[in-house]
């Protein structure tokens, strides 16, 4: 009896289809997001189209001093001013990450480091290489906390996330975010009133598309809608940690520990002579 692989091989030999055509026909479960993925397309922020900010939001933006983006004082060239504010000397920045504080959400998700998606009963887990952080995306029918429940839980670096499938798109909402963590590497702020919607759609065996919308009426006058973020599957043996391939065969530990920060991490990122590039 012919196996499927035999049929595919025979089809190629007889010229019935190209390898690329057959690859496009590979079956996949659109509701299975498991695997190791890495953002390969999309802005490092929500998007380049930043909504008009409230006075309170503008003040918070000005207080944040990033080391990434174009330098403060350079021509905007059509960019939002938030992307042209980087300090020229890393030690003059005040990025919380430089003190080994968590990236928080959505910043960690926007970082182009590998992340593993793991399906469990009633949850989707996201295990990040950077920080070795874990997000729990609840899918057991619960709603995101609100009112007194949210107040009692208090803010969290990665918030409180719940959602459900809408067709073959996984829709998640996150609330209760700690406002000390920046939205992105550029220092855009978020308030504790922020709600972020994520919409994950698996478009192929090796791709997931993510669309996000940030709602924060305290800092932004209208919702901030993302561009399309594309996640590409990474083979476990090809997962890289700062250029090291296959040494650990999967997600590895990328933790910034305060005791290390004082010695090496701090010298690289905060010492002007270190010539380091902050994450």
Summary of predicted features, one role per range:
Residues 8-19:
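Bacterial N-terminal signal peptides
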Residues 23-279:
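PEST-like low-complexity, intrinsically disordered acidic/proline/serine-rich tracts
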Residues 1-5:
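Positively charged n-region of N-terminal signal peptides that target proteins for export
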């Amino acid at each position: 009896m012919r196996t499927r692989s035999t049929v595919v091989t025979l089809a190629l030999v007889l010229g019935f289809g190209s390898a690329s055509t057959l690859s496009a026909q590979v079956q996949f479960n659109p509701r299975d997001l498991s695997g190791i993925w890495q953002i390969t397309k999309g802005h490092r922020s929500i998007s380049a189209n930043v909504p008009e900010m409230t006075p309170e939001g503008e003040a918070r933006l000005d207080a944040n001093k990033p080391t990434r983006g174009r330098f403060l004082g350079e021509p905007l060239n059509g960019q939002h001013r938030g992307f042209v504010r980087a300090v020229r000397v890393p030690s003059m920045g005040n990025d919380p990450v430089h003190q080994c504080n968590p990236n928080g959400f959505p910043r960690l998700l926007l970082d182009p480091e590998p992340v593993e998606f793991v399906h469990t009963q009633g949850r989707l887990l996201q295990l990040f290489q950077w920080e070795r952080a874990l997000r729990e995306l609840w899918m057991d029918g619960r709603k995101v906390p609100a009112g007194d429940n949210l107040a009692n839980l208090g803010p969290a670096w990665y918030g409180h996330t719940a959602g459900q499938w809408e067709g073959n798109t996984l829709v998640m909402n996150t609330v209760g975010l700690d406002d000390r963590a920046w939205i992105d590497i550029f220092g855009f702020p978020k308030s504790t009133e922020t709600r972020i919607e994520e919409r994950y759609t698996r478009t192929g065996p090796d791709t997931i598309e993510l669309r996000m919308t940030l709602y924060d009426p305290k800092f932004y006058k209208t919702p901030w809608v993302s561009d399309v973020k594309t996640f590409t599957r990474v083979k476990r043996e090809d997962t890289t940690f700062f250029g090291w391939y296959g040494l650990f065969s999967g997600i590895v530990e990328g933790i910034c520990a305060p005791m290390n920060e004082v010695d090496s991490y701090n010298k690289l990122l905060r010492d002007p002579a270190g010539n380091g590039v902050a994450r």
